[in-house]
């Protein structure tokens, strides 16, 4: 499968199944496009047939010199022979093996607090309550959750635990106690816990910062961008904005972590479709690690992104990519999560095919110990998998998630970005279509654009080296 596109003056050709990316001149771009119109997948041998050259000369001869067309065809043949162009699908045959693979639990999202001190207007957790009641996780439930993770992690040594909410700092003592318990259990069971925390920063102080820097491998700091944008969507319950309180704390924390192992994480809505300005605002505040996610909501929500917003969003990603290139050239570069693509390595085959591991390798735990496939399914009875006392009592839910992959979704099968997004978010699929075996179309369009921008940036920055 070939995907071709032009962006910021670059002609880019992606070979989906080999993962190869080529930056080519106009004639090579057009030659590849023409031979790719064949009803059958081109091979090195078929490209050498005389009629291929003849058709190219007929089609492109009025645009390019004959010698240039011949050279471009020769390059295409060489790339095809080298397994970098027109590579056949070698992944679909692995699906059954991936579906049958034995999985272990590697990560837990601990809902340490089903309560929050903000009232964000787009919050899927309903101010932290998750379709239920306000509650704080007890130390006893948290211990059982860590014990469950150790017991169900098999031979895997490195385990991940994210303290989530609501707002985790509203239950700070239990967070500290559970980290201490985890460190004790590491020695007993030859495990290593990688703790992370997601916070709105309202309760952040020097004592918490010191502990976080000592014990947390990563910190997610919630902020939506410019003051007027953040305060519109992330107010306190009395309507007052949160920006002025939290930004200085976040700046201090980021500096104390040497601008590493954290993310400023925002959400953009219909209210700020010019979200590239929010990313640049983060950069101007001194942050180096950032992400801004599209809100996901019902179309009836006034802030929800709709299909008619997509052209503007595409423009913003292009604009952001160009601004990031300029900042990098000026020595003021920063990382944007959605443009971070590893073209040399990347995730294993199972991850490329089936995604984040929700429901199988990654689970969410409520304050009272119930287990769900991920934080976005919490509170939905159909996805209650078990609890920390009894373990998984509905393995059929895990089986359903395990069977979900880019080949089980019709919309993914012929998508060039399928190995970069691994089929997208299953919670979004369920919320929009009532099944995890579908995709959220607006999210797909944005993902494809982000992949294109990320690869273009690599080409542009390679030119500077």
Question: What is each stretch, according to the model?
Answer:
Residues 402-453:
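Cysteine-cluster motifs in flexible loop/terminal segments that predominantly coordinate metals
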Residues 228, 232-244, 251, 255-358, ...:
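Radical SAM enzyme [4Fe-4S]-AdoMet core and its adjacent flexible, acidic
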Residues 1-38:
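Acidic, low-complexity/disordered tracts enriched in E/D and polar residues
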Residues 40-63:
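Short acidic, hydrophobic short linear motifs in intrinsically disordered regions
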Residues 142, 146-162, 171-295:
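Radical SAM/AdoMet-radical enzyme domain recognition
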Residues 64, 71, 75, 79, ...:
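Conserved alpha-helical substructure of the radical SAM core
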Residues 146-164, 400-401, 439-465:
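Short Fe-S-cluster ligation motifs
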Residues 312-345, 375-422:
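C-terminal accessory region of radical SAM enzymes
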């Amino acid at each position: 499968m070939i995907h071709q596109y032009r962006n910021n003056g670059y002609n880019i050709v992606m070979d989906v199944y080999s993962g190869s990316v080529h930056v080519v001149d106009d004639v090579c771009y057009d030659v590849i496009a023409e031979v790719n119109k064949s009803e059958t997948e081109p091979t090195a041998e078929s490209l050498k047939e005389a009629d291929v050259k003849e058709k190219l000369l007929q089609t492109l001869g009025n645009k390019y010199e004959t010698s240039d067309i011949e050279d471009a065809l020769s390059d295409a043949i060489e790339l095809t022979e080298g397994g970098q162009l027109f590579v056949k699908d070698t992944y679909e045959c692995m699906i059954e093996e991936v579906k049958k693979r034995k999985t272990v639990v590697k990560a837990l999202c601990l809902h340490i607090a089903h309560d929050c001190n903000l009232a964000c207007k787009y919050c899927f957790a309903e101010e932290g309550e998750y379709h239920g009641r306000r509650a704080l996780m007890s130390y006893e439930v948290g211990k059982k959750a860590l014990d469950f993770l150790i017991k169900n992690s098999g031979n895997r040594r490195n385990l991940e635990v994210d303290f989530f909410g609501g707002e985790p700092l509203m239950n700070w003592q239990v967070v500290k106690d559970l980290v201490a318990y985890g460190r004790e259990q590491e020695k007993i069971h030859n495990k290593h816990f990688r703790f992370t925390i997601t916070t709105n920063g309202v309760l952040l102080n020097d004592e918490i910062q010191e502990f976080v820097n000592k014990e947390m491998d990563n910190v997610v700091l919630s902020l939506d961008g410019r003051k007027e944008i953040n305060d519109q969507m992330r107010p306190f319950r009395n309507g007052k904005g949160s920006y002025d309180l939290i930004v200085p704390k976040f700046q201090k924390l980021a500096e104390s972590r040497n601008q590493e192992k954290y993310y400023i994480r925002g959400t953009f809505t219909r209210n700020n479709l010019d979200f590239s300005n929010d990313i640049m605002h983060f950069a101007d505040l001194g942050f180096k690690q950032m992400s801004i996610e599209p809100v996901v909501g019902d179309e009836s929500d006034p802030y929800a992104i709709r299909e008619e917003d997509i052209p503007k969003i595409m423009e913003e990603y292009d604009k952001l990519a160009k601004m990031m290139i300029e900042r990098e050239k000026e020595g003021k570069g920063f990382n944007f999560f959605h443009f971070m693509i590893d073209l040399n390595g990347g995730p294993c085959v199972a991850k490329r095919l089936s995604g984040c591991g929700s429901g199988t390798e990654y689970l969410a735990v409520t304050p009272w110990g119930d287990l769900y496939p991920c934080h976005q399914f919490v509170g939905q009875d159909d996805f209650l998998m078990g609890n920390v006392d009894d373990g998984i009592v509905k393995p059929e839910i895990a089986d359903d998630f395990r069977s979900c992959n880019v080949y089980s979704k019709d919309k993914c099968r012929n998508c060039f970005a399928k190995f970069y997004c691994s089929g997208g978010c299953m919670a979004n699929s369920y919320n929009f279509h009532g099944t995890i075996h579908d995709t959220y179309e607006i999210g797909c369009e944005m993902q494809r654009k982000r992949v294109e921008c990320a690869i273009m940036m690599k080409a542009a920055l390679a030119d500077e080296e």
